[in-house]
Amino acid sequence: MTWANNIGLYQKKKYKDALEVAASKGTFVHDGIEDFIQNGNELDLDKVPPGYQKEVNFAYGSFKSWWTVISKRNVKVIMQEHKLVCPWFGGTLDLLIEIDGKVYLLDFKTSNNSSYKYFLQLAAYRYILKYYYDIEIYGCGVIKLNKKYIGFDEFIIDKSHPEYEGFMNICERTFLSIVYGFINRTLVERNYNNIFVG
């Protein structure tokens, strides 16, 4: 609520505008990460609007800090910025990576907050990877990249803890129930209109 008031009532900014700015910063960071992993290129800050450069640079630097740590292990990139689609939903995964022989599904976030909703998203991708690509995921995680200084937080859950696997299974069932609910509501509305509206 405080954040909404700060960008809305007191700062005279529209909520939608604030979301677009945040999304734009995240897009610059994601594009930089993609180019670095695929081609070894560093982020070109000259392509980033001046008002975004500081936060984008910190977030990208936070990624590089994470990458330096993870690169000390046996790492193989399987997919990056890859579109995943099934008949009912889809999205774009950030990174599917093998670390020491175990497959992890990772999502990079530049937002200031964390949410269980990130794991609903990962559960949806995990579902598609399992049933449409025959890829078994060992672990899922959110890598939160700081925009104020160089630093990152990892929110990783994997099969080494049974309660973590249980959590991901609940996330998958929850996400699928939302999808099924939407589909069924659409069918109810369509059938109602066919029967009563004509």
Where are each of the predicted segments found?
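A structural signal for short, well-ordered beta-strand segments
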Residues: 80, 95, 140-141
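Active-site-adjacent loop/helix micro-motif of nuclease/hydrolase catalytic cores
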Residues: 113-120
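Short, charged, amphipathic alpha-helix that recurs within catalytic cores of restriction-modification
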Residues: 120-128
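Metal-dependent nuclease catalytic regions and adjoining charged, substrate-binding loops involved
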Residues: 128-198
